[in-house]
């Protein structure tokens, strides 16, 4: 956490603040509405099924160079977190085959398809990549617009701190 004071570093939010989250409005902190999207195999996955542990929802597109650059660090984070939290990558791509070039079945992150972009619209997402950290109760705690390196230690500490 370069540039952060030792007081900030020692707070529970310190690791999250090191990732430079974007401000949230009061309404954004409300309970996230449930959604259900197909994964790469076509199986429907709901946000409700992920509740009870932290969830990082990251909106992605194959035509977005920063998204493609960010994807390996999301995979690494998902592998590091294991069952402690969920990393859900939500793709707005219409072409499932394009998406399969970047993620294989059995990916450590859950890869979901939002071809209609209804879920991304419900989050107010219009820039990619954009990620939201949701606590176990289903409330958005942090929003991150633009690419991040999710493989840094602060990312795992931030998410694990919400358990």
Task: State each model region's role.
Residues 18, 133-163:
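Thiol-/selenol-based redox modules, centered on thioredoxin-like
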Residues 26-29, 34-55:
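A short beta-strand-turn-helix
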Residues 61, 92-94:
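Active-site loop/turn elements of alpha/beta-hydrolase fold enzymes
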Residues 51, 59-76:
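Conserved redox-active cysteine motifs that mediate thiol-disulfide chemistry
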Residues 2-34:
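N-proximal helix/coil linker or "cap" segments that precede and/or mark the start of modular domains
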Residues 96-100:
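Acidic helix N-cap motif at the loop->helix transition within catalytic regions
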Residues 56-57, 87:
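Hydrophobic beta-strand anchors of alpha/beta hydrolase catalytic cores
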Residues 88, 103-137:
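Short, internal strand/loop/helix patches
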């Amino acid at each position: 956490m370069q540039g952060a004071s030792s007081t900030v570093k020692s707070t529970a939010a310190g690791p999250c603040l090191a990732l430079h989250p974007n401000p949230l409005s009061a309404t954004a902190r409300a309970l996230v509405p449930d959604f259900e999207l197909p994964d790469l195999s076509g199986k429907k996955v709901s946000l409700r099924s992920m509740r009870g542990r932290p969830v990082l929802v990251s909106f992605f597109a194959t035509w977005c160079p920063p998204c493609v650059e960010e994807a390996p660090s999301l995979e690494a984070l998902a592998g590091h977190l294991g069952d402690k939290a969920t990393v859900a990558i939500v793709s707005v791509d219409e072409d499932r085959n394009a998406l399969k070039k970047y993620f294989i079945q059995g990916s450590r992150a859950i890869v979901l398809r939002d071809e209609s972009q209804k879920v991304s619209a419900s989050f107010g997402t219009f820039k990619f990549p954009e990620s939201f950290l949701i606590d176990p109760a289903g409330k958005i705690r942090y929003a991150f617009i633009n690419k991040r390196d999710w493989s840094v230690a602060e990312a795992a500490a931030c998410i694990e701190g919400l358990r």
